[in-house]
Every structure is written in structure tokens, then in C-alpha cells.
Amino acid sequence: MKVVIAIDSLKGSLSSIEAGMAIREGVLRAKPDARIVVKPLADGGEGTTDALIEGMNGERIDLTVTGPMHTPVKAHYGYLKDSNTAVMEMASAAGITLVPDDAKDPLLATSYGVGEMINHALQKGCRNFIIGIGGSATNDGGIGMLKALGVRFLDENDVDAGEGGQALAKVSRIDISGLNPLLREAHIQVACDVNNPLCGEIGSTYVYGPQKGVTENQKKQLDEDMAHFAQITSQALGTDYCNTPGAGAAGGLGFAFLSYLGATLTPGIELILNAVGLKQELSDADVVVTGEGRLDFQTAMGKAPVGVAKLAKKHHAKVIAFAGSVTKEAAACNKEGIDAFFPILRNVCTLAEAMDSATAKANMTATAEQVFRLL
């Protein structure tokens, strides 16, 4: 029996690999002769970098970059030496969690630190990039990131247009001659799970701006400024990605990646499953095990475990899911490729007790053992 395990992290409790290894132990207790493969799982959002570092023998690279409010912040990315790949989350450098609620300012917030991370990885030898762009604090169209990478944005007086959302309206000329030449050799894949265009009522400013501090009175003007920036970009580069699905992700960072860096935008789970080589392992799997901290209706809507399940079903494998907790609505997962799911709790306890890593590991192992005794 070949068993492939790819379970998302149980946040605050077990990492993806820790959960996978706990399941592995339980499977071996029940099926000592089983062939078991454990792969990291993430959806391109928070935790993706750490999951791939741990699961693919990567190296964590720590660095200090310019934060969203122009002060130094500690960021990190993953370095996968074998494939010269950098795995990073823009939120590490320009995330909304780095800005206190009372300090959010879309006119000032910059993505400059994201460009600094990319530069650092390029200098280290990385030529392949997997970049998650969820959880941004910015609405700058990617101007900050691009400036760090060498692009010049000039106003009508040929003076630097500045940074943040306030720079969008000032840009009248773009000079890409200083763009980091190493980018010509780079292949950038962006994990993007939103389909919003750059501008308009379903664009970046109207939909995601409010959580970044955009007021009702600012929406229209900032959206018009973003459209102006897109028009100047189109004139300078001869491209038009304004209405491309995902262009509005991360305050227009999706647009910047498409227009200036030749990146591809891919659903996060699809990108990660390809990166960890899960498809190859599933080709001859008998049973696939997945799961996450909480299995609910959102899981069925396409989160990482369902992504694994759908891929597994193409190879006719049985799919089992384990979770820290399971809601009634999780039954919808049975229609999305998960044959059976199981909560791992074995007794009544507090949330803190359930999330204790040693307890969660023991519960995961014990549940996996009992389930695999049936197989």
C-alpha cells in the first residue's frame, strides 16, 4: 500500500510536516509495510514559505527591509538551493499585520521591501521565484517594489514621483533602463487567489482598499489615480494588463508583476502542488491523506485539502482528511473528493489543551492508526 500524506498546518499547533509525520507514525503502527511519502502543503498564503522550507530542505534567509510605513522590518524568505528557487510572501515585507490599525495610510504605504527581498534573492543566485501576495498593506500599484528593482517613476518635471498611493497620480514618465538585469533570467510565479481587475468597482481600491485604510471619500480618487498609472504603464511598455484577472491583487502588485516582470499568476494551491511534486507521487498512490486545522464549508470551496483531493481523484486514490475540528458544514467536502474525514480530538478539553503541540501530535497519530486499521 502506498500512502501519500499532504496536510496543511494546524496553525498554532503543528506545522504541515509535523502533522504529516505524526500521521505517518500512526499509519506505520497499523500498516508496518506501507510505503509512505510525506509532502508539505500550503495554499500560497500565510505559512507557505515556512512549509516549503521545512518540507523541501530549504534554507531560511533572514534580512531587514523597508517596511510598509518606510521603517525597517525583519523579513524572511526560503532558499531552495537545488532548484535555485526563492519562496517568499510579500506580507513578510509589506503585510498589513506590520501596520497598527491607527497607522494605516494607503497614500504612504509602500511595497518597496518586496523589491528588496527579490533583489537579495537574485544576488544569492535565485532565478526561480514562488511569491505569495496575500495580506498586503499597500495600494501603490507595485510602484515601491519596482523602484527597489530599478524602475524610475518620474513626474511632469522629471522628478521622482515618490512612493505609496500618493505617487500614482504623479507618474508621467517611466524609465525601465535601470531594472535589475538579473530579472531577465528570472522565472516568477505568483500565487494569486483573487480575480479582481486593477480598477473599477471590483478593482483593488474599491474591494480591498478599506481594510488598508482607504476612506469612502478616497475611493474614487485613488481608483482614478490607479487607472492613470495603468495608462502610463501601457504607453511605456506597450502592454495592457489592467483588466487581467488578478491584476488588482495586493493593491495592484499583481498588475506590476504582470506588466513589468513577466510573471504568471496562478492559484496558490495549484502552484504549491506543482512545486512540491505531489502530482508525480499521486500517480501510483492507493490512499491520500490531507486535512487542516479546521474542516468546514470554506474547505469545500477550494482550500488546500480539496485541491489535494481533486488531484488524487484523477488517479483514483482514496482520500482521507484529518482536522483539529470539524463542523457540520464539512460534509460538503465529501462532494469535493474527500471520501471520509475525521476530527482528531479524543476527549473533552479546552482549546489551549487541544492546540498543545504534543497533544495534537498524539491525537493525530492515534486517529491515523485507528483509521488505517480499517484499510
Question: Language-model features: where?
Answer:
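N-terminal loops that bind phosphate or other acidic moieties
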Residues: 2-133, 137-375
